[in-house]
């Protein structure tokens, strides 16, 4: 069981953010989302929006639907055969599930970083260059080089890899591989970055590095992160949504959720009474 239930534990790398959530219009607006696996309903009528330039954490006990909900945001559930999503997800006013939307393009606008780092079996350079190439984002080799460098810099990896760009991505450490995957997502100019427990396969030092990076990236992107760690949610997010049994129980500023939750179920979860 995950024992990491307290936001203020010793050794926290960043202090819990006390910033108020931004008032900007939502980057993604989800209305009345219902998700089914065959006849089983995994998400029940969830309405939730995600602002730009902020990190929103999705927390809740195992099986409560965090990953299922996250996957709705870039239509990754389309790839699961018996999965059906109902409701509206608006991005810039357009429903992402509309037939006219190309899911491949959508996934470049809404990038995703997974639990286990999953670099392509290619060089460090090609891991980053692949997306810009297929999306036609570079008009010359110099352009592509510049995108690769900028993405690696933004992901805080450039200094560590600049002299071995032709080495395989898989030759990097786990934490470096996860930053490579973040750089790969950034390279196609996303507006939103989804992270599904991005640190769960990493040691504390690599985790701290990724958390610092998330804090840096939120100045530019709308970030949604699923995490089992209360400490992590408190450290990196400005807003937190608590899920239970496929329902959204409470959503608010991270500080409020952890210090003064409105719902008893939220309080029970964050104080470690269940989950
Ligand atoms: N591919 C699938 N087919 C059928 N049911 C699924 C599938 N994926 C998830 N589920 C079910 O949907 C529910 C929500 O699962 P989900 O993985 O979204 O929860 P979670 O909160 O992310 O869990 P965890 O924290 O353990 O990763 C669970 O009951 C799970 O068994």
UniProtKB/Swiss-Prot annotation:
It catalyses: phosphate(out) + ATP + H2O = ADP + 2 phosphate(in) + H(+). It is a peripheral membrane protein. GO terms for cellular component: plasma membrane. Residues 28-270 form the ABC transporter domain. This is Phosphate import ATP-binding protein PstB. The lineage of its organism: Bacteria, Pseudomonadati, Pseudomonadota, Alphaproteobacteria, Hyphomonadales. It comes from Hyphomonas neptunium (strain ATCC 15444). ATP binds at residues 60-67. It is found in: Cell inner membrane. Part of the ABC transporter complex PstSACB involved in phosphate import. Responsible for energy coupling to the transport system. The complex is composed of two ATP-binding proteins (PstB), two transmembrane proteins (PstC and PstA) and a solute-binding protein (PstS). It is an enzyme of class 7 (translocase). Its EC number is 7.3.2.1. The keyword Lyase does not apply.
């Amino acid at each position: 069981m995950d024992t990491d239930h307290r936001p203020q534990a010793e050794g926290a790398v960043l202090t819990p953010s006390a910033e108020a959530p931004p008032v900007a219009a939502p980057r993604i607006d989800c209305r009345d989302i219902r998700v089914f696996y065959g006849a089983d309903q995994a998400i029940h009528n969830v309405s939730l929006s995600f602002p730009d330039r902020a990190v929103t954490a999705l927390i809740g006990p195992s099986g409560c639907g965090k990953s299922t909900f996250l996957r709705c945001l870039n239509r990754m559930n389309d790839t699961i055969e018996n999965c059906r999503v109902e409701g509206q997800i608006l991005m810039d006013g357009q429903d992402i599930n509309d037939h006219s939307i190309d899911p491949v393009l959508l996934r470049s606008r809404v990038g995703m970083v997974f639990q286990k780092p999953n670099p392509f079996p290619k060089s460090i350079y090609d891991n980053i260059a692949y997306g810009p190439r297929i999306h036609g984002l570079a008009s010359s080799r110099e352009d592509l080089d510049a995108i690769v460098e900028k993405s690696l810099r933004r992901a805080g990896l450039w200094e560590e890899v600049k002299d071995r760009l032709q080495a395989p991505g898989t030759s990097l450490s786990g934490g470096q591989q996860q930053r490579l995957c973040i750089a790969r997502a950034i390279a196609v100019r996303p507006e939103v970055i989804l992270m599904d427990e991005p640190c769960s396969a990493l040691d504390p030092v690599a985790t701290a590095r990724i958390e610092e990076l998330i804090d840096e990236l939120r100045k530019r992107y709308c970030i949604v992160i699923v995490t089992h760690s209360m400490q992590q949610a408190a450290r990196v997010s400005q807003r937190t949504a608590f899920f239970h049994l496929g329902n959204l129980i409470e959503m608010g500023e991270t500080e409020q959720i952890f210090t003064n939750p409105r719902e008893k179920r939220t309080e029970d979860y964050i104080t470690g009474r269940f989950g």
